[in-house]
Amino acid sequence: MTVTISFEPYVGSSVDALSIPLYLRCQLVFKLSKPLAAVPLLESGVNRLVQALPFLSGEFTAVPASDGGKEILLVRPVLNFELSRILKIKYHETSLRHVCKQMNRPSSQGGDLPHEPYMPYPRLPDPSRPQPIVGFQVNVHTDGIILSVATHHCSFDATGMGSIVQNLAACCRSPPSDEPDLTTSPAQEAEARKVLSQVRETPFDPKMFPEYRPLDSMLSYYKGVQSALQGRQTTIVNRCFTIAADKINALKRRCNQLIPEMVKKYGLSTEDAIGSAWVSSNDVVAALLWTCINRARYPEIRERSVHQLPPDLLHATSSLGVPVNVRSRLSPPLPKSTLGNAVCLLREKVPLQFFALPSHANMEATSSVCADHSGDDEWALSFCRVAYGLRAKLNAIDDDYIRDYISYVQKSPCHLSVTLDTENLYLSNWREIGVYDADFGGMLGKPLRMRAPDGYTDGLIFVMAQRSEDKSAPWEFNISLEASTMKRIVHDPLWCKYVELDAFWHGEE
């Protein structure tokens, strides 16, 4: 189907230029009695979406600068655009359960991962060719549909991907005679890019944001990322888990009760305490996963108290990277529905000993190894310290910080990006992207489940969208670890106290 689409080419914002050149991808599951009947609805929805937001039909490319400086990261229209370029429809004579079980299998001999046939594009695009910035694949099964979505990370962050899903849902449920109720417009997106590219009149300090590394070129960066990911996917295990909401709430309450004592015990500044004298559910979940992964990576931490750690662990550090949505942190704030990248990286580094057992733990007793120690006040204070540190860093990301960050990126003589080897652990939190609230209309309804299939980088975690209509729904997340670490973590008493394997994706029924 040839579609007439027109828009002016545009250069991405400063923040767009920081993102890793790959596709953010998710899968949405719809259980349906008549899945074939829903295909025309989705096809029409994608068509209406690109008519209303024509830049979504565009392609990303890096263009050499005429002055030999940084490459220009451009989104441009496609000549003779056809809908099939961004929408693929595949029919599978299998059930949803069959495909979920199939996707559990790791790749072998470096081949494609089992979910790749269900995705519109590979995770890593060909750097020598223009790349569509959006793609959809409708996978039709005997009892439902898996809608796979891919958005180019140099154009959109996870919040933007969620907004694209919500706008597609609006195009599907809206009657053909009505204009769909979209959350954004081309003009709004252009204004957001302008805001995210405003530069302060301050000198460039190359040491100001060390978490962003200089790149020789976008092409060499593509090749480096591709080599690193393809070389690891045979040794990494990706699994889906859940945590009950009431367990998270209980842990959060305990942390918040302990903050005054914790601030006093560790001699933290009162000024800091006033500004961040609380922790959120997100902080607690991040701290819990960070703790459990370190216990699995370094068994001595789980088995010994601080004073019993070997010198290499006693003096080691652990770092966590968390992309932070800055839309609401700017002044004035950007609309929540802004599609383009609006994130910066929070980087927290702490001594590894913060995750060790309480100093009084009796390691002569077998029960100490089997206990999770989370009921111990000393353990809880140390855990609270980790969660509190994350909250303090988050509270420091304000309008001034973001403006300095944007200016730093703009004034850098070369492109910058986050590389996945700069931190021990990355946690990408998609709780607020609204995918479970996306109503596609009577035939499809709202997604039953979602997942991010693209872990396969050691220590990469995706926290899935929340269900706003059900506050008691468990938290869902995907995690990728080395096989040996995954084997240890699922037998850790602390992990087992809070975390369960997601039966939808990994169950037998």
UniProtKB/Swiss-Prot annotation:
Gene3D superfamilies: Chloramphenicol acetyltransferase-like domain
Entry's Gene Ontology molecular function annotations: acyltransferase activity
EC class: transferase
Keywords: Acyltransferase, Alkaloid metabolism, Transferase
Pathway connected to this protein: Alkaloid biosynthesis
EC number annotated for this UniProt entry: 2.3.1.-
Catalytic activity: (2R,3S,11R)-aszonalenin + acetyl-CoA = (2R,3S,11R)-acetylaszonalenin + CoA
GO annotation terms (biological process): alkaloid metabolic process
Subunit (UniProt): Monomer.
Role noted for this protein: O-acetyltransferase; part of the gene cluster that mediates the biosynthesis of the prenylated pyrroloindoline diketopiperazine acetylaszonalenin. The first step in the pathway is the formation of (R)-benzodiazepinedione by condensation of tryptophan and anthranilic acid catalyzed by the non-ribosomal peptide synthetase anaPS. The prenyltransferase anaPT then converts (R)-benzodiazepinedione to aszonalenin in the presence of dimethylallyl diphosphate (DMAPP) via C3-prenylation.
Similarity-based family: Belongs to the fumigaclavine B O-acetyltransferase family.
Full protein name: O-acetyltransferase anaAT
Native organism taxonomy: Eukaryota, Fungi, Dikarya, Ascomycota, Pezizomycotina
